[in-house]
Amino acid sequence: MRFDPPLEEGRLLRRYKRFLADIESAGGERLTIHCPNTGSMLNCMSEGCRVWFSRSDDPRRKLPGTWELSETPQGRLACVNTARANRLVEEALLAGDIPELAGFASLRREVAYGVENSRADFRLEYPAGALFIEVKSVTLGFDETAVAAFPDAVTLRGAKHLRELAALARDGVRAVQLYCVNLSGIEAVRPADEIDPAYGKALREAAQAGVEVLAYGAEVTTEGLRLARRLPVRL
């Protein structure tokens, strides 16, 4: 996935009201852009940090740009646009770059399932039956250990998805929790129990129920993103 048109560089002035960010471009222009991330963005939004944004010429848009990347205090690049994760995973699925999930006959997005009114990010159909996938974008890295963590804020919705996946697995349906690690320089992933212990508990229970827990690390550059390799998940 390449950024087209190319991203522009700037520095962060502030993020506010969840979906807004003020930045200063490399040319000194001050802009208010869209922040496409509902999380805390812990470690991705320190004042003055380098950011990269995409610009749109669509006259229907209220804001001229979208925040795409941040440089973390550890010098890593993080893709903060959470919508990119699903597109990146779909691109990898269709290219056969996730061997554990290869061989499907069809792919559907945003499929309703479960008893708690959930929507799976993807439903894949195989000769042996269906497979449901929930995708989570991971950008949180606490220190220099090269271990990323999820979530970066308490997520009741994320725990609900794990319960739904676990129920499928208990019924004999393949269910996958897939972490798309959009943070450079990462070697493993773990639940952020210090932020949301209930989510960590739900993840371990889902794994015990038969949910397949996968993590894939993206190659993150200012030119584009590519799902590069599988990473271990430390439960």
Curated annotation (Swiss-Prot):
Name under which the protein is recorded: Sugar fermentation stimulation protein homolog
Family listed: Belongs to the SfsA family.
InterPro entries registered for this protein in UniProt: SfsA, SfsA_C, SfsA_N
UniProt source species: Pseudomonas paraeruginosa (strain DSM 24068 / PA7) (Pseudomonas aeruginosa (strain PA7))
A GO molecular-function annotation: DNA binding
CDD domains for the chain: SfsA-like_bacterial
Pfam family, one: SfsA
Taxonomy, superkingdom: Bacteria
Disulfide bonds, paired cysteine numbers: none
